[in-house]
């Protein structure tokens, strides 16, 4: 299974960071470089219908080798990495036979991956880990998923004794900025059901996710020389702070877990004259999700009424919804994945996704798509890592799912 590791190391060398502020599709041209590379690799494997469209979506399929009518099965991952941290010049480090102590990622900058801060790493004592060098994210989200899917499909194509229906694979741009499914052609993809391989911890199986929205707030001020500012100046930074204080502090990401939702400020740029804020809003409950959006709108209204002028402009935009209602209609897709994990000695961890995947949107576009683990941990930052055995097991799970569908 060295193959999956080699692929992963190759893919993370591509800088594919997406950009929320871009209006192009994909949001960054550099995602296309990886996409075109994947196209050539899929052709070499011998897949059919290999293509990359103008929007950067890569698709291909392996034809069925049985006559039995079974659902066409899809596997999907995304090519972009998070805007939250650089994905340029990723330099993976191997930690073999992890001993349970601190891992020095970057000695010069004193960046340490410590069990004191990330106690879950102790689960992987004795295993080989791939970490960052402390300067970038790693890109396991979701280049590990791409490597796992391609390795599994390559293995199946080389072993005709493995019976299977049609297997479709797709790699999307811009998932990290909530646009991964925007131009996904479900009909062209050709699957009846699918799985994203975009989860985290070893064994994760997910079919519930956040309802998600973004909020962009612009606060207008009035700049006057501070020496003569009394009763004249309106400091937009101060007004923005007022707005922030109206958000429930206990409902921030750092205070929530499980099925709890949150408000998360992700950007703050300001001067006296103008301040811009960006939030993301998340909740599993549709009602609580709507309440959270309303609270933000009401906060803007309250401040504008307080000052007697429209200082605060707010735009709230839905991004994706909880896929559970769609997956429940075809629950067998979860049951088969659960069984596949058990058969290859992976303990399934069925839990809600405290985030989103392309599968959330795709499920509402007629393609039910739960989420499988990649094995990665601490996504979107310099403390990201992935155990190599988890990647190898993810490949086994994909192959076993394919086999079980052929028996359906």
Swiss-Prot record:
It catalyses: Release of the N-terminal residue from a tripeptide. The keyword Cell division does not apply. Its cofactor is Zn(2+). Its EC number is 3.4.11.4. The active site is at 80, 175 (proton acceptor). GO terms for molecular function: metallopeptidase activity; tripeptide aminopeptidase activity; zinc ion binding. CDD domains: M20_peptT. Keywords: Aminopeptidase, Cytoplasm, Hydrolase, Metal-binding, Metalloprotease, Protease, Zinc. Its main location: cytoplasm. Zn(2+) 2 binds at residues 141, 176, 380. InterPro entries: ArgE/DapE_CS, Bact_exopeptidase_dim_dom, Peptidase_M20, Peptidase_M20_dimer, Peptidase_M20B. Zn(2+) 1 binds at residues 78, 141, 198. Binds 2 Zn(2+) ions per subunit. It is found in: Cytoplasm. It is an enzyme of class 3 (hydrolase). GO terms for biological process: peptide catabolic process; proteolysis. GO terms for cellular component: cytosol. Belongs to the peptidase M20B family. PANTHER family: PEPTIDASE T. Cleaves the N-terminal amino acid of tripeptides. This is Peptidase T. It comes from Clostridium acetobutylicum (strain ATCC 824 / DSM 792 / JCM 1419 / IAM 19013 / LMG 5710 / NBRC 13948 / NRRL B-527 / VKM B-1787 / 2291 / W).
């Amino acid at each position: 299974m060295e193959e999956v590791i080699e692929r992963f190391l190759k893919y993370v060398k591509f800088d594919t960071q997406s950009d929320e502020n871009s209006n192009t599709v994909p949001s960054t041209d550099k995602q296309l470089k990886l996409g075109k590379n994947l196209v050539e690799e899929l052709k070499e494997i011998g897949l059919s219908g290999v293509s990359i469209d103008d929007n950067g979506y890569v698709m291909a399929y392996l034809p069925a080798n049985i006559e039995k009518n079974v659902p066409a099965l899809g596997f999907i991952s995304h090519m972009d990495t998070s805007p939250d941290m650089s994905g340029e010049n990723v330099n993976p480090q191997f930690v073999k036979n992890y001993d349970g102590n601190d891992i020095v990622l970057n000695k010069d900058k004193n960046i340490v991956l410590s069990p004191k801060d990330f106690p879950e790493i102790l689960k992987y004592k004795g295993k080989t880990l791939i970490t960052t060098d402390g300067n970038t994210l790693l890109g396991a989200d979701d280049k590990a998923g791409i490597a796992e899917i391609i390795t599994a499909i390559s293995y199946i194509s080389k072993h005709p004794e493995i019976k299977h229906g049609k297997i479709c694979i797709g790699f999307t741009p811009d998932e990290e900025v909530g646009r991964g499914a925007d131009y996904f052609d479900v009909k062209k993809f050709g699957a009846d059901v699918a799985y994203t391989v975009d989860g985290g911890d070893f064994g994760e199986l997910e079919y519930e996710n956040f309802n998600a929205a973004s909020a962009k707030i612009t606060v207008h001020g009035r700049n006057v020389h501070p020496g003569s500012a009394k009763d004249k100046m309106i400091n937009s930074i101060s007004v923005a702070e007022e707005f922030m204080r109206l958000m429930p502090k206990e409902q921030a990401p750092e205070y929530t877990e499980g099925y709890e939702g949150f408000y998360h400020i992700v950007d703050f740029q300001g001067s006296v004259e103008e301040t811009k804020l960006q939030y993301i809003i998340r909740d599993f409950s549709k009602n609580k999700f709507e309440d959270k959006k309303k609270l933000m709108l009401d906060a803007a209204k309250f401040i504008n009424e307080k000052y007697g002028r429209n200082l605060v402009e707010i735009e709230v935009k839905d991004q994706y919804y909880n896929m559970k209602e769609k997956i429940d209609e075809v629950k067998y897709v979860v049951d088969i994945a659960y069984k596949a994990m058990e058969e290859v000695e992976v303990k399934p961890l069925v839990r809600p996704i405290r985030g989103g995947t392309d599968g959330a949107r795709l499920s509402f576009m007629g393609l039910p798509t739960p989420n499988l683990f990649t094995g990665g941990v601490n996504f979107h930052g310099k403390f990201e890592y992935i155990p190599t055995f988890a990647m190898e097991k993810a490949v086994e799970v994909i192959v076993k799912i394919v086999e079980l569908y052929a028996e359906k």
